[in-house]
């Protein structure tokens, strides 16, 4: 939609088990090729994640190209919702990077094929705490396999990406007395985390 500045890509990777499902993320990609590659990669991952979880749904993912701070709003989200609706239920979306519950509510105005709505509207609410807890449990399982104990105390753990999921994960790790390092490309997110927690900041280029 050139008028609204909406440029989105929906990747449906697999529908053998059911309709494709995966969140929508908004990102200021360097190129359309980068956006397509990301959508393809993420949709493939959703196929495996949904299958492993024993869900009767396939894998899909959507990306919206652009700076969320500049172009995102009700009109854009509703237009995107109409596009999803045009797929007739082949793809269901939900919240991902730079998207909110409110964005899902806007999309819901145009299509029923959306999850992650607010609790007051019968949804599950913010998925970030649950996502973070899943990562936390996976960390403990890995540590137990390697060290024989699932304690994270005194373990050095780096969290790259300090959005909602990263913030909740850091909170869990700090409670377990882990030594937490953090990295993000956005200074405001680093500032918000360092004001809340005692962590060590690492430059993104130094992570690997």
Regions inferred by a protein language model and the residue ranges of each:
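N-terminal ligand-binding/catalytic initiation module
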Residues: 1-122
């Amino acid at each position: 939609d050139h008028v609204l500045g909406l440029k989105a890509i929906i990747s449906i990777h697999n529908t053998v088990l059911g309709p494709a499902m995966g969140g929508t993320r908004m990102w200021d990609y360097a190129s359309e090729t980068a956006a397509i590659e990301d959508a393809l990669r993420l949709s493939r991952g959703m196929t495996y994640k949904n299958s492993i979880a024993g869900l009767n749904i396939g894998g899909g993912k959507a990306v919206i190209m652009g700076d969320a701070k500049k172009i995102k709003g009700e009109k854009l989200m509703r237009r995107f919702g109409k596009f999803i609706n045009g797929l007739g239920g082949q793809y269901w979306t939900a919240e991902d990077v730079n998207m909110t519950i409110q964005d899902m509510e806007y999309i819901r105005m145009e299509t029923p094929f959306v999850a992650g709505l607010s609790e007051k509207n019968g949804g599950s609410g913010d998925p970030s705490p649950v996502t973070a807890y899943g990562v936390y449990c996976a960390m403990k399982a890995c540590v137990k396999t390697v060290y024989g104990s699932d304690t994270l105390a005194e373990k050095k753990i780096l969290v790259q990406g300090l959005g909602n999921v990263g913030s909740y994960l850091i909170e869990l790790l700090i409670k377990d007395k882990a030594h937490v390092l953090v990295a993000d490309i956005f200074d405001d997110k680093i500032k918000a985390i360092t004001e809340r927690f005692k962590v060590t900041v690492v430059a993104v280029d130094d992570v690997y």
